Amino acid sequence: MCKPQQKHYGRQVMNTQNSLKQVATATMVGTAIEYFDNYIYAMAAVLVFNHQFFHAVDPLSGQIAALSTLALTFIARPLGAILFGHFGDRFGRKNTFVMSLLLMGISTVVIGLLPTYDSIGIWATILLCLCRIGQGIGLGGEWGGAALVAVENAPEGKRGWYGTFPQLGAPLGLLLANGVFLGITAIFGQEAMTEWAWRIPFLSSVILVAIGLYVRLKLTEAPIFLAALNKPKPKRLPMLEVVTTHFKPFFLGMLVCIAGYVLFYIMIAFSQIYAKSAPTVSEAGYAMGLGFSPQIFTALLMASAVSLAITIAASGKYIDKIGRRTWLIWTTVGVAIFGLSLPLFLENGTTTSLFWFLFIGMGLIGMGYGPLASFLPELFPTHARYSGASLTYNIAGLFGASVAAIIALPLNAHYGLKGVGIYLTLNAVLSLVGLWFISETKDKLLS
C-alpha cells in the first residue's frame, strides 16, 4: 500500500491524504451546523420561546428572558474550549473534533423534543437551559477544531484561504436556517409555527450532523500535529499554558474578536426584534419597532447572506497578501462607523433601508470573521493551539455575544437607536486597541 505523500514547505509539512475537498467539507459542515443552530435558536427565541417556555408579564420581559438563554451557550463555551482543547492538544484533533460535533448535534435535536411550559411548568425552562449548556460545551470545542484542521492542513502561503473554509459555514447555516423557517411558515402557517412546527428545524439538524460525522471520520491527523506528539509535552495543562505563557496573544485576541461578536448578535437578534415588533414608542419616547412581517425580514436576511459569503471568501484571498492585522484594522474601523450610522438605516423604516442595513452589516461581519480561523491559531504553538484558539474565541463570545442583544434592547428603549449604535462603536474601539498591540502572523511558521 502506498504511503500518503508529504510535501515540505520550509519547516511546515502538508499531508496530501487530506484533500482540499475533504478539509473544506469537514470544516465547513461543522460551522454550518453551529450557525444553523444559532440562527434557528435566535429566531425561535424571538418568535416562539417567549410564549412556549417563559411566562412573562409583558412582551419585552418575555423577549429578554428568552434571549437570556442565548447567553447560556456562551457561558458554557469556555468550558467546552477547556475540555475539548485539552484532549485536542494532547491526543488528537480528529477524535475531539468528532465528539464536539456529536454533543452539539444531540443537544440541538433534543430541543426539538422538549415539552413546553404548559405541559410540565418550570421544568420545561430548566430542560431548555440544560440543552443550551450542552450546545455551548460542544460549540466550545467545535470552532477551534475546525480552524485547526483547516490551517494545519494548508500549504505555506495559503493558510488564510484555507482558514475561510470553516468560516463559510456561517452563510450556509444562515441560508439553511432562514430557508427552513420560511418554508415551514409558508406550508403550515404562522400559528402552527408558534404551536408545534418550530420543532422541525431543530430535529432536521440531525441530517447535517450525519454528513459532518461521515466526512470527519475519514480525516487523518495533519503531519505538523503528529510531529508535535513526538516532542516532550509541557507539564502544565494546555489551558494553564495559554493563560500564563501565552497570556498576551490570548488577551489581545479576545479584544480583536469582541466587535464582530457584538455586531453579529445585533444583526441577527436585536434587529430581528426591532424590525418585527409593532411600531410602538417607549416611555422615553423612542421607537420600539418597525412592524415588518417575519417573512419579509427573513427574506432580507437570506439575501444578506450573499454579502456575508462574498466578504468571507474575499478576506481569505487578501489576508494572505496584505496580512491579517491590516485587513482587520480597516474592517473594525468600518464597524465603528457603521455603529454611528445605525439610526440612518433603521429610523427610516423602509424595506430598502432595512435591506442595506442587513447587507452592509453582514458584509462587515464576513470581513472580520473570515480571517479569525487562521489568525487565532497562528498566535499559539502546536501543543497548545487547540486550547489557545478555542479559549480566545469563546471567552470573547462570553463578553461580546452573550449580552449584546440583552443590552441593546433596554438601550434602545431608554436612548434610542443612537444608544445601540454607540454601544457597537465602543466595542469596535476595544477591538482596535487589541489590533494595535497584537503582532502580524501572516509569515509565521507553525511550530
Curated annotation (Swiss-Prot):
Superkingdom classification of source: Bacteria
Periplasmic side: 50-63, 118-119, 189-194, 271-295, 347-354, 412-418
InterPro entries the UniProt entry points to: MFS, MFS_dom, MFS_trans_sf, MHS_symport, Sugar_transporter_CS
SUPFAM superfamilies assigned: MFS general substrate transporter
UniProt keyword annotations, A-Z: Cell inner membrane, Cell membrane, Membrane, Transmembrane, Transmembrane helix, Transport
Cellular component terms (Gene Ontology): plasma membrane
Transmembrane residue ranges: 29-49, 64-84, 97-117, 120-140, 168-188, 195-215, 250-270, 296-316, 326-346, 355-375, 391-411, 419-439
Membrane topology: Multi-pass membrane protein
Positions in the Cytoplasmic compartment: 1-28, 85-96, 141-167, 216-249, 317-325, 376-390, 440-447
Protein's UniProt keywords contain Transmembrane: yes
CDD domains: MFS_ShiA_like
Keyword Lipid biosynthesis: no
Subcellular localization(s) per the UniProt record: Cell inner membrane
Main location per the UniProt record: membrane
Matching Gene3D superfamilies: MFS general substrate transporter like domains (1.20.1250.20)
GO molecular function: transmembrane transporter activity
Family according to the record: Belongs to the major facilitator superfamily. Metabolite:H+ Symporter (MHS) family (TC 2.A.1.6) family.
Protein name, UniProt field: Putative metabolite transport protein HI_0418
